[in-house]
Structures are given as structure tokens and as C-alpha cells.
Regions:
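N-terminal signal peptide c-region/cleavage motif recognized by signal peptidases
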Residues: 20-23
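Signal peptide-directed extracytoplasmic domains
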Residues: 70-131, 136, 140-145, 149
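C-terminal soluble interaction/assembly domains
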Residues: 249, 270-354
């Protein structure tokens, strides 16, 4: 039901060998989709399910559960059908409903209410995940090419929050650098060093264990090159502790990367000039305009000049110009020429269209 490629991404050796030199970000393509349970197919049950789907999608778009506590959310929920694109039952499961929303309309609502908005480009993390069986004490490491109930629960939780993890492939290079004891013991430096080959900005390590019939404990840390956080969650089921872990991780990342849309409400958007080279025809120009306006940080993009194969745009931003630069590079559609950290270049950013 939850497409693995959009959630916990399993990376092959070839991808690692030829990976890009810059920090990886995932493009999350299903932010406007939600799966919800539907026990009966009467009209009232469907309306309730669609409202639940709306809440799930709004949390994904914002990155924070605070969005559904906003004073205007109830009014949005009461008019939910204005934002629904389609609904369909999941193949082979008549109790699961897939609801797809108009993402652009929902993002406009988020901006109008000055709530955080998290774009589709989201930082990836290499996830070392180990679980210990309560009875046998046997330990399992989640890795490339394998599937089990724990991974399914993780996939579902990640889909519901719009985040992505990369699992280690555990080839000879991985097992030489990182052992089962390292993961179980959560040896921070060893795991962070072992994750560097995956070129992700974050390393996450999870240790999951069942303490008794109705007691589960999940210990985890999140580390970047400059930050470290350690946490522990407990609950009565595996489903609950995995859900809490993903919720906490997502809320953490959203506070760092989601856009503050107050500029939209105050009509104080920042304007930035950018030029894009290698625009060879009208088709490429149309693709560029569509791409720029699809970015959450961009309120609108106006073509100012076309000179030869170089297009100059005035872009109205909801965030800082440096944020736009990083989003553009993460999207892998352009090659940067300008260094935005150079004060002499801050007025005009320059790129090549791929």
C-alpha cells in the first residue's frame, strides 16, 4: 500500500558509487496523498475518512501537527470536498481509501494563515535500525533487500509524515566499519563515520526492544556534523513507539527546514533576480517557469528578459535567497554558477539548466 521507493529508500551500490557530491535531499512526491481506514462505505463514514485524510495531508505539507490545531482548520475541514482531487479504494483492500488532494490549493491555505510550509525537497538520513526479539534476544538490522513487519510499520509512519530514510546495504564496506554491537550500543561516532559513504546530512540510529508484553522502548539519536540529539520513547505497542519516533523526528526537521510564510500574509516577500543559461527553446522556458513556480519557497516568478539562450527572472520569495539556492541545487534541475555566500553575487544568482 505504501510505495517503498517514497519512504525508506533502499540504495544500491551503483547509486552510492556515482552519487552526487553535494548533500542529498529526497523529493517527496506524495505529500498530497493519504490512506485512511473505511470500515463501512456509507456517505457519513466516507466524509469522516476524507476529513481524517485532510488532517494527515496538512500535517505532511506543514511538517507539524500544530497546523490541525489552528483556529481556521475546522472551517477548512468542513469544506474538505473543495480540495479533493480524487478518491479510490486500495486494490485488494476495500477498507482502505486513498484520498488525493489539490496540493496547490492547500498550500495557498497554509500561506494565507501564516503557517509553516515544508516543500518537497527534504533532507535524507541514513538510518541504522536494530531490533531485539523479546524471547530469543535475537537481533535484526534493517537493511537493503529485506522486508519484515517492522519495516512495514516504518514505511507507513514515514509516508504519513512525508519523510524518507535510507537504509544501509550492509555490504563488506558497511560491516567492516559498523558491527551489530556498534548499532545496539549506539556508538555515535562510529555510526556517523560509517554513514558518510551515503552522503546524507543526517545519521539516525534506532534501538528497538520489547521489555514485556505491553511495554516497548525505542532509543534513538539524530546527528549531523554540527548537532546531536538523543531521545527515548516508550509505549505499549511496536506500532506506537515507531510512530512516536517518526513524529518526533519529523517535527524536529520541520522546525529547521519548513518555511515561515508570514511574508505572504504581510505581503513582504523578498525579490531575487536569477539567470538561467542553456534555455534553447520555448519548451525549456516553459519547463523552467513551471519548475520555479512549483517550489514552495517561490510565490511567483516573472520572466524579465530573454537574451539568446539566457533567461532572467524576478523571483518573489517566502524565504531567504540562500534558501532558494539550496532548494534549486537539491532539486537537481540546475547547475549553480554563482556562490550565494559571496556578497558581490547576492543580487543576481546564475545557473545552467540541465
Amino acid at each position: 500500500m505504501f510505495p517503498r521507493s517514497h519512504l525508506v529508500r533502499l540504495v544500491s551500490f551503483l547509486v552510492l558509487t556515482f552519487s552526487c557530491f553535494y548533500v542529498q535531499c529526497a523529493t517527496i512526491n506524495d505529500l498530497n496523498k493519504a490512506y485512511v481506514s473505511l470500515k463501512t462505505q456509507d456517505t457519513r463514514s466516507q466524509e469522516t475518512a476524507i476529513r481524517q485524510a485532510l488532517a494527515q495531508v496538512m500535517v505532511k505539507l506543514s511538517g507539524s501537527e500544530s497546523v490541525i490545531k489552528h483556529e481556521q482548520f475546522r472551517a477548512l475541514s468542513e469544506n474538505v470536498m473543495q480540495y479533493v482531487t480524487s478518491t479510490q479504494f486500495v486494490e485488494g483492500d476495500s477498507e482502505q481509501l486513498l484520498v488525493i488532494f489539490n496540493q496547490a490549493k492547500l498550500e495557498k491555505w497554509v500561506k494565507r494563515n501564516a503557517l509553516p510550509l515544508w516543500g518537497a525537497q527534504r533532507p535524507e538520513a541514513l538510518l541504522w535500525f536494530i531490533e531485539q526479539n523479546n524471547s530469543s534476544r535475537f537481533r535484526t538490522i534493517l537493511m537493503d533487500g529485506e522486508s519484515n513487519d517492522t519495516l512495514s510499520l516504518l514505511n507507513a509512519a514515514a509516508f504519513n509524515r512525508g519523510v524518507e530514510f535510507i537504509l544501509p546495504i550492509m555490504d563488506i564496506e558497511d560491516v567492516t566499519q559498523v558491527s551489530e554491537i556498534d548499532i545496539w550500543g549506539q556508538f555515535i561516532d562510529t555510526l556517523h563515520t560509517g554513514a558518510q559513504r551515503y552522503n546524507t546530512p543526517y545519521t539516525v540510529s534506532v534501538k528497538l526492544q520489547q521489555l514485556s508484553d505491553q511495554s516497548w522502548q525505542l532509543d534513538y539519536f539524530v546527528k549531523s556534523n554540527t548537532e546531536l540529539e538523543l531521545h527515548q520513547v516508550t509505549d505499549t505497542t511496536k506500532l506506537a513507539v515507531i510512530g512516536k519516533f517518526v513524529d518526533q523526528y519529523t517535527e524536529r526537521q520541520a522546525t529547521r527546514y519548513a518555511l515561515d510564510t508570514f511574508r505572504f500574509v504581510e505581503n513582504s516577500q523578498i525579490q531575487q533576480l536569477i539567470t538561467i543559461n542553456h534555455v534553447t527553446d520555448i519548451v525549456a522556458l516553459s519547463q523552467i517557469e513551471a519548475y520555479l513556480t512549483s517550489l514552495s519557497i517561490v510565490e511567483n516568478a516573472l520572466l524579465l528578459e530573454q537574451r539568446g539562450t539566457t533567461s532572467t527572472f524576478n523571483v518573489k520569495l517566502l524565504g531567504q535567497p540562500q534558501q532558494l539556492h539550496h532548494v534549486l541545487l537539491q532539486g537537481n534541475q540546475v547547475v549553480g554558477i554563482t556562490d550565494p555566500e559571496d556578497e558581490l553575487n547576492t543580487r543576481l544568482f546564475e545557473y545552467y539548466w540541465r
